[in-house]
């Protein structure tokens, strides 16, 4: 059996790289494993180029100074960089995107959470939106943070540690029930 896998375009999550400060090369390697479509900013493009990583799209209104001749330009226009990238990915039919960033503002991602599956890697945290009824197996003693506001959160398998911080009570599944369409949670990498 061949070790080469054929992946159809857009089956795997795209990769939006907004910043690499403090992001582990091994973790980046895992995100690059299936040759995702890579979208980035000019500054981060230089860092990726130095590592020999092929970029598909650069988010910029500037069109000069190509690092690689086959890079496409994604204009920002009057949007934020995040909105320009998300709108592009949704329009192109991507079901999911992994995002590596040095800055995280939940409000920038909320408008897209019901349109594309988001997984955000920020400061040794993995952040993602979950629906009510979500459950996941984790070892005991792991930290789970609730990043979205909710007034009717019911948990199982978690002990409250701080305002929005929970610790898994034992090896096994934890679950979350709430009234909102989704909540953003984070776990440590």
Model-based region annotation:
Residues 21-23, 102-105, 123-127, 151-152, ...:
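Short acidic/polar capping segments at secondary-structure boundaries
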Residues 1-21:
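N-terminal nucleotide-binding beta1-loop-alpha1 segment
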Residues 128-189:
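Long, charged alpha-helical interface segments
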Residues 12-13, 55, 141-143:
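Short, surface-exposed beta-edge/turn micro-motifs
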